[in-house]
């Protein structure tokens, strides 16, 4: 019998996380695929003819959540400042330049994702 790299419990939890971030897959060049006994794989930076430039396997739902949250956060923080000097700052520094309302919206979105994932 082939070795399994993810428990059934973690498979179900990772599926919830992958589904919760469905909107991210429409915003950026990223997706999560169920890789069976190997867990879930985050694929990023697609190029036709080349495939995905980055792949990372996950067998823990919290690690998958943190990875997808990081990508969502970076997209939301960086996209509005592309082409400006602020784009040279790191993500947390850019976050600090946002209005308090926008900062709260982003933090609320993290709480929303946590609730969807039930973690």
What do these predicted ranges mean?
Residues 34-108:
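Acidic, low-complexity, intrinsically disordered interaction modules
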Residues 2-28:
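Negatively charged, low-complexity tracts enriched in Asp/Glu with abundant Ser/Thr
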Residues 21-23, 30-34, 56:
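Short, exposed beta-strand/loop patches in secreted or surface proteins that constitute
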Residues 1-5, 111-119:
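Short intrinsically disordered terminal tails
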């Amino acid at each position: 019998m082939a070795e399994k790299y993810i428990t059934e419990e973690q498979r179900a939890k990772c599926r919830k996380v992958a589904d919760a971030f469905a909107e991210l897959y429409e915003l950026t060049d990223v997706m999560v695929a169920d890789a069976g006994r190997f867990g879930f794989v985050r694929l990023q930076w697609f190029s036709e003819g080349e495939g995905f430039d980055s792949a990372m396997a996950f067998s823990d739902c919290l690690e998958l959540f943190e990875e997808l949250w990081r990508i969502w956060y970076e997209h939301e923080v960086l996209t509005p400042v592309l082409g400006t000097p602020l784009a040279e700052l790191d993500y947390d520094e850019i976050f600090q330049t946002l209005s308090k309302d926008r900062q709260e919206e982003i933090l609320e979105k993290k709480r929303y994702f946590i609730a969807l994932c039930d973690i």
